[in-house]
Amino acid sequence: AYVDQGTMVDTWATVGSCAQIGKNVHLSGGVGIGGVLEPVQAAPVIIEDGAFIGSRAIVVEGVRVGTEAVLGANVVLTASTRIIDVTGSEPKESKGYIPPRSVVIPGTVPKQFPAGEFGVPCALIIGLRKASTDKKTSLNDALREHGVSV
C-alpha cells in the first residue's frame, strides 16, 4: 500500500496491499480500503488527493475515487456497484469511478428476484462538494449541506 503525506487514517481503518491513497485524504473510523496482490492484472484501489471517506465506507476491486470527492458513511463501492448521478434531470449510471468533488451516499435500486422485488445497494452522487467545505470547515459539512446525517 502507498499512503501519501498529510493523509489521516482514523481508528480501525484498514488499507489493503497495493492500494494507493493520495495526499491529504481523510479515512474515517472503520473504513476498509481493499487491496489486491493477485491476479497480477487486477487494478488497485486509488483514492485521489483531498478525498474524504466517511465512517465504515468500503472501497474495493480497483475502484477509483476522484480528487476531493466525499463518500458518506457506509458507502460500499466495488467494481460492479452501480454509481448513479442523480443531480441532473435524468439519472446517469456508471461503475468503478467517482468523479472529482462528488458527494456520494449509499442508496438502493429495485431488483426482481423469484421471491419478489428487493433493493440492492448502489451509490448515489447527490451533488458536488462546495467551496465552503474546502479546508475552512469540516468535510462532514459537505454531507450536511445535502441533508445527509453523518
PLM feature segments, named:
Residues A1-Q112:
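Structural signal for interior beta-strand "rungs" in well-ordered beta-sheet cores
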Residues K95, P100-S102, P106-V150:
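Terminal amphipathic alpha-helical/low-complexity segments used for targeting or macromolecular assembly
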